């Protein structure tokens, strides 16, 4: 998990201030979301890697998340993690080779070294109807939260079926620490990935 230092986070804030031509912190706090979206391409060009993410602030987050998982210093509870098929513009069908999926599987493997609790891995690869963006970042949330009817897209019967299954899986995981019998844990012996197509 890409964890940032406080110095990196403050520099990102400074870069946003400069790119948006804002002079004060007060003005920055009032920056409309649309303005932030407009300057993102310039911000991404200036930065290497992911621009936003968890920050080690020594109050809420006291260490790098990946280090904590690798060294067994995180809550010993079952874990569910996954990817969307076209996150960060990954080409269709290439999600298994993406840096995001690699990060998910490395996290699962590190977690398995220090815990007897299961890790469940998923890939949401359903290409949403309405355009050619595929399974973009956060597109799975409409399905998990059952809010397909609020989306502008013309969802199909298949989408509602996927949503029902995802809601059931997430609910079972929350209630029973297990998302259901058709979803096996990700282990060294069986690298099972539950795919929502």
Regions found by a protein language model. Name each.
Residues 102-105, 109-197:
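Mobile gating loops/cap/lid regions near enzyme active sites that modulate substrate access
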Residues 1-109:
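Substrate-access "cap/lid" subdomains that shape
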């Amino acid at each position: 998990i890409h964890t940032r230092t406080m110095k990196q986070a403050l520099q990102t804030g400074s870069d946003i201030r400069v790119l948006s031509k804002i002079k004060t912190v007060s003005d920055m706090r009032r920056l409309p979301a649309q303005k932030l979206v407009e300057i993102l391409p310039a911000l991404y060009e200036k930065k290497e890697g992911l621009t936003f993410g968890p920050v080690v602030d020594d109050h809420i987050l006291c260490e790098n998340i990946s280090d904590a998982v690798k060294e067994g210093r995180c809550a010993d509870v079952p874990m569910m993690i996954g990817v969307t098929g076209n996150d960060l513009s990954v080409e269709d069908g290439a999600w298994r080779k993406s840096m995001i999926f690699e990060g998910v599987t490395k996290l699962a493997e590190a977690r398995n070294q220090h815990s007897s609790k299961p890790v469940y891995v998923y890939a949401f690869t359903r290409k949403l109807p309405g355009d050619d963006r595929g399974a973009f970042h956060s597109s799975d949330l409409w399905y998990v939260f059952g809010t397909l009817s609020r989306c502008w897209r013309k969802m199909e019967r298949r989408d509602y079926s996927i949503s029902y299954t995802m809601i059931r899986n997430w609910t079972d995981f929350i209630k029973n620490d297990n998302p259901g019998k058709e979803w096996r844990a990700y282990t060294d012996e069986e690298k099972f990935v539950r795919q929502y197509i």
